[in-house]
Amino acid sequence: MDDLTLRYFDAEMRYLREAGKAFAQAHPDRAAMLDLDKAGTPDPCVERLFEGFAFSMGRLRQKIDDDLPELTESLVSMLWPHYLRTIPSLSVVALTPRLSVMKMAETVPAGLEVTSRPVGPGNTVCRYRTTRAIPLNPLAVEKVVMTTEPDGRSVLKIGFACSELADWSQVDLHRLSLYLAAEAPVGSTLHLMMTKRLAALYLRLPGNDERIRIDGWFSPGGFAEEDRLWPKGDSAFSGYQLLLEYFTFREKFMFVHLNGLENVSLPAGISGFDLEVVLSQPWPADLPVTDDVLCLHCVPVINLFTLEADPLIINGLESEYLLRPKRLQDGYTEIYSVDAVTGSGRTGSAEYVPFTSFRHRGGMLRHDAPERYYHTRVKRGVTGMYDTWLILGGQRWEADRMPERETLSLRITGTNGQLPRRALQSTLLDRCEQVLQTPVSVRNLCKPTLPVYPPTEDRFHWRVMSHLGTGFLNMLSSAEVLRGTLALYNWRDDELNHRRLDAILAVQHHRIQRFEKGFLLRGLDVEVTLDGNGFAGEGDIHLFGEMLNRFLALYADMNQFNQLTLIVQPEGKCIRWKENHSPRLPG
């Protein structure tokens, strides 16, 4: 994490040493007491003076350069709160039930806690939770092999092991989720082949030489509302979170859903079966396919957990109060959000409501609502970590703030900060709550990511408001504007993301009008030209296009449809998506 305070401090110290020596040479009589023109160990008193001055001036320069966040943070926090929140550490875990004892499917609810082994100098246990519910079926992927049909087409053979005790009438195989746990080139190519290059789907039962044709298909995962990685604010737009998730954690989109298997009647007592996925084009010979590239029962996890903050004693003389996580002063725990604030005093207790919910008195013309509210601000601390400050307000709070001291109890959502990645060599997510009848083991399939913090430089908040104040067509006015819009969501300093954005060469849009079933339909045909060399293969291009297509569908006007076309250079290949008709308001 970039420590701005340390950067400004070092800059001021360099200036004092370099400029001080030059000043001492030019004016030896005035600078003699600074002891700067002598070789050897510097005077500790002078060093202490320089360090104190450098810290003060560094903070002053940092304040001058921060583009007045007081003017922008309040508006951004109310309308687009996701721009001010940290994206915690993320990973994907596989839940493995004990197959031999499973008789029916069970569902693991969202929010299942998954913990790591003790890591770091304080042996801290990092706590994650699942982002969505996941069904556990009496199935397991046993083998994955890429073979060839007699006509030369490639075939992906997936061998499933089954519980012999399973009652298949109690198992719903609709939308069977598979995670592509492979390196990026293999994973993106598999994603493309299974979702866009499927020629036929067959089921082969043991002891049966004839294979059964299945009317099925694979659909891309990670784009549904229930697939969100973190909670969405009431006023936030779904499309913006989609962009953040794509540029921050692309592993979320490495899921595919098998549709159609629910229409097959599996015999009782079956020990396994093979699924043969016939592809419409040859599989690249330089991309290896191994048994562990496909996994069942996988789900993303996020480093969030509920805890209490240290009680606050409100004296009425301060406008902001620094929050500290209770009992977790380990140097890593950070506050993600404040969920509940309750005050207690001599006259009783009172509940505070979030200011952004407009549920306080006067908000949205409510005159019988609670008269106390709270608001939070996130500031960069001198340690480089982000501190959360609590701001209180309301008519009753203003009236009672001076005569009575009040103690606040706070329930917050916290995160372990950078600890999971800093202790990466020993970080394994291999423990979870046992909430089901069937014993379940867990392991992480990818390394926990570093948390990502909102940008604070390059006038970020002003660029956000400029972007969000424009319309849909303005975003598509040129390649530069579209690149700038997408760059607002590229919070990671990742070279591959920069290459994908730089690969946008041109953007054009044309209005479409046509009559269909007696109605006049209006739409927009969006054409984006890409440089194929900026992506890691054809699968990477298709995934980028799928993300852009979903975003445009959410962003478009409710009374218009849109259609995306990608032109990939230098081949000139055309990739066209279906029309997106929005029956409701975006979000």
Predicted regions and their residues:
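Short, Φ-rich (hydrophobic/aromatic) sequence segments
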Residues: 45, 49, 53, 75, ...
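Extracellular ectodomain segments of secreted/surface proteins
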Residues: 57-64, 82, 143-153, 159-173, ...
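Residues at beta-strand starts and edge strands
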Residues: 89-91, 152-156, 172-174, 197, ...
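Extended assembly-interface regions of large multimeric machines
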Residues: 1-207, 215, 219-220
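Mixed-charge (acidic/basic) macromolecular-recognition segments
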Residues: 1-30, 34, 217, 226-266, ...
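Short, low-complexity Pro/Thr/Gly
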Residues: 163-369
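C-terminal domain/tail detector
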Residues: 29, 345-587
